[in-house]
Amino acid sequence: MSGIDTIWEKVLANIKHRLAPASYDTWFKETKIKVLNNHQVVIQAPTSFISEWLQTNYIDFIQEAFIEEIGEKLNIKVISSEDELMNNEKEAPVRKTQQTSQELLPNQLNTDNTFDTFVIGSGNRFSHAASLAVAEAPAKAYNPLFIYGGVGLGKTHLMHAIGHYVMEHKENAKVVYISSEKFMNEFINSIKDNKTEEFRSKYRNVDVLLIDDIQFLAGKESTQEEFFHTFNELHQNHKQIVISSDRAPKEIPTLEERLRTRFEWGLITDVTPPDLETRIAILRKKSEEENIDIPNEAMLYIATQIQSNIRELEGALTRVSAYSKLVNRELNSDLVAEALKDIIATSKPKKVTIKDIQLAVGEYYNVRLEDFSAKKRTKSIAFPRQIAMYLARELTDFSLPKIGEEFGGRDHTTVIHAHEKIKNQLETDESLKNELKNIEKDITS
């Protein structure tokens, strides 16, 4: 045991002596010390929920324990294992492509995200089958594989599962997982540092490229150009490409047509929110993994209240378990309702404002907020502005003059014209229907 570990053992013993057993087990039992130098200490908690709770409620308590044990006041920071994972990914240096997948991926793939831990339901069955087929026969089954769906529904889990499977079954396979935002940032840095050849070598000399959240490249013309050539080289060399997005290729605005076409070469599959049976199965599996003793009626309550995505569902279970230990009460439906009252209250439909609409439409069509009020009439701004006016009439109770006022003081007749134009276009334009469906989802989520 290292010196700092010994100090932390003493601090924990001090804390344990002063806390109720249930509180200690809930908040401190799984913590570790990561850094202790220059009057600073970094403590690692197993989850973001616990790290935030410690940072908010126990910093002074921890400070007192350190003072008693080492006689020194320290600057204390609490992080989670997830924080460290993200930081490692950001800081990981560019490595030579000759490395094996086992060397490439320790900080890129979540070890929990495998096919074995994925809960299959009606909303993801096809995507799971396609992902497994790709993992078993890279570049032979479906290339590219394009998985789309909302936040927290399992897209990234499936991509990580593909990566793990290939690493396990294909010796020395080169696998890279990256978000499209990080791809763009690395590309920009490679230009700045005059290292574009290194960048290209890193992403074009792999057996499997897993790229997450491709919709982030919308409007990023230079990065789209670079990814276009990366895609072509990998595809021509029979290397597997797996892409995820929050929407289908044809619904990503300002995506170059040549990229859109290539994304449609292989298989496009979607994941949808889990049904009740799947949500219960997810909770049951998670409770078994975490050794959480939860009765069926309490599990059913969580599953009926948290319907949006898997991430929130699992987070709710963790919160309920921690709350039960903290208050030292049996885990039942009443306690679940008490523990989740804030989450359930915030999950109810919110009142939509015109600014909410402008922000969502602006993000979708890459338009700045101030452009909705500007006098500009270019098509790239005028059309999104009309969309926003249409949605303002459909989703809010504001009067026509009030809507016009929020769009730079425009006359109410302009709002009527915009509403009628979009309404008529929706009758024949399926693509526009899908775009509005995605925007409305963003507004109300």
From Swiss-Prot:
Q: Which GO terms describe its molecular function?
A: ATP binding; ATP hydrolysis activity; DNA replication origin binding; lipid binding
Per the UniProt entry, the signal peptide is none
Q: Where is this region: Domain I, interacts with DnaA modulators?
A: 1-72
Pfam families xref list:
Bac_DnaA, Bac_DnaA_C, DnaA_N
Region (Domain II) residue spans: 72-107
Where is the stretch described as Domain IV, binds dsDNA? 325-445
Q: For ATP, which residues are the binding ones? A: G152, G154, K155, T156
Q: What is known of its domains?
A: Domain I is involved in oligomerization and binding regulators, domain II is flexibile and of varying length in different bacteria, domain III forms the AAA+ region, while domain IV binds dsDNA.
The job of this chain, per UniProt, is described as: Plays an essential role in the initiation and regulation of chromosomal replication. ATP-DnaA binds to the origin of replication (oriC) to initiate formation of the DNA replication initiation complex once per cell cycle. Binds the DnaA box (a 9 base pair repeat at the origin) and separates the double-stranded (ds)DNA. Forms a right-handed helical filament on oriC DNA; dsDNA binds to the exterior of the filament while single-stranded (ss)DNA is stabiized in the filament's interior.
This one is known as Chromosomal replication initiator protein DnaA
Q: Which organism is it from?
A: Macrococcus caseolyticus (strain JCSC5402)
